Amino acid sequence: MDCVFCNLAKEEILFENDLAVAFFDSHPVSQGHSLVIPKRHCATYFDLTKEEIASIYELSQKVKKYLDNKYHPDGYNIGFNVNEAGGQSVMHAHMHIIPRYKGDVERPRGGIRKILK
């Protein structure tokens, strides 16, 4: 399969468990921008099993703790883009963990809505 997420190099992986892996985004929108993905190739969040969702959640907590200690962000945006119209560019389900910092945008109210504009 020709999927960039299915072919991650071991040294790129920050954390992993039986069903998921976490790594830094190769095109970050902020310092520490990370992704958590299922090991199994599936296109979107809605294709994940309950077990995969639980594994992704478990790793998201580890990533947050790591980012808190390393980068000291002031907040986070997290979420999944689904399909091309929803902003998904790699058709392998992935959770974005985007650290936010005071002053990174003029008025952060509205969170992700501001990033998208």
Please identify what each model-predicted range represents:
Residues 1-117:
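HIT superfamily nucleotide-processing domains
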